[in-house]
């Protein structure tokens, strides 16, 4: 069994790029309330490894799980889905 197929992937929006080689990605998911059936938005922030400091706030990225890189960082960026809009 190959380990490459076992890594989980998520997509989310970069909300912070102030750390060196680390970005914070906000991942949102929709869940149905078990009793009332209302669709709710749940979110979680992940610290993600960005080796070249190439991703910035507002970018939409795909991340995948990897070995622990620090106390709070166990995800890395796979690819850029959408670049943030530049406001001039």
Swiss-Prot record:
Entry annotated with the keyword Transferase: no
Record Gene3D superfamilies: Nucleic acid-binding proteins
Top-level taxon: Bacteria
Family recorded in the similarity comment: Belongs to the universal ribosomal protein uS17 family.
Protein role: One of the primary rRNA binding proteins, it binds specifically to the 5'-end of 16S ribosomal RNA.
NCBIfam families: PRK05610.1, uS17_bact
Name of this protein: Small ribosomal subunit protein uS17
Organism expressing this protein natively: Nitrosospira multiformis (strain ATCC 25196 / NCIMB 11849 / C 71)
């Amino acid at each position: 069994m190959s380990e490459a197929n076992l890594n989980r992937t998520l997509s989310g929006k970069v909300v912070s790029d102030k750390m060196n080689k680390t970005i914070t990605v906000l991942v949102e998911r929709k869940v149905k309330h078990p009793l009332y059936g209302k669709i709710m938005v749940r979110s979680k922030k992940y610290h993600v490894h960005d080796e070249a400091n190439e991703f910035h706030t507002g970018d939409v990225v795909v991340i995948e799980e990897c070995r622990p890189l620090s106390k709070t960082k166990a995800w890395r960026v796979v690819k850029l889905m959408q670049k943030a809009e530049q406001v001039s």
